[in-house]
Regions:
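Intrinsically disordered, low-complexity regulatory segments in ankyrin-centric signaling systems
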Residues: 1-25, 30, 34-37, 46
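Ankyrin repeat A-helix N-terminal signature
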Residues: 8-13, 42-48, 75-81, 108-114, ...
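Ankyrin-repeat inter-repeat connecting loop/turn
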Residues: 28-29, 62, 95, 128
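Alpha-helical adaptor scaffolds
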Residues: 45, 49, 53, 57-61, ...
Length: 155
């Protein structure tokens, strides 16, 4: 019951409720919803910076993957949430994990034109030589999308 309540509070961006539920039962930070998302994955999916900060205080598995194999960092790189990307990296999110298609956070950021996040990932040591399941690097994806500024960064 409290698990569903936690996920609903996250969806509604109810910061105080999220903090109260996790304070009462910190192990809920590791639970997953029907889509395989942890509380951190869900908060980052919606771009809820403060909810993500609250959840991080309860030491979640920062690199937990959803049903598609995506981490919270991959999700924010796809969506362009730079503040949360910075927060996750500051909390030691792994930069070079891959999902079911062998895509990395850098590949997501490059593919979707997130120059600020590409810069952040590179500055923090993301491996730009990693290839996805099709054998393509982040540079290849940027070129295919015609995103010249990112292609130059990755060259």
């Amino acid at each position: 019951m409290r698990t569903e309540e936690l996920f609903n509070a996250i969806r509604k961006e109810e910061q105080e409720t999220v903090e109260a539920i996790l304070t009462e039962n910190p192990t809920l930070v590791m639970e997953k919803d029907q889509r395989g998302s942890t509380p951190l994955l869900l908060a980052t999916y919606y771009g809820y910076n403060e909810i993500a900060r609250i959840i991080l205080k309860f030491n979640p598995e920062i690199d937990a993957k959803d049903a598609s194999g995506n981490t919270a960092l991959m999700g924010v790189c796809f969506k362009g949430f730079i503040t949360i990307a910075e927060l996750l990296i500051a909390n030691n999110a792994s930069l070079n994990l891959t999902n079911g298609n062998d895509a990395t956070a850098l590949i997501f950021a490059a593919t979707f034109g997130r120059e600020d996040i590409v810069r952040l990932l590179l500055k923090n040591g993301a491996d730009k030589t990693m290839k996805d399941a099709r054998g393509l690097t982040a540079l290849d994806h940027a070129k295919m999308q015609g995103i010249k500024n990112i292609a130059e960064l990755l060259s």
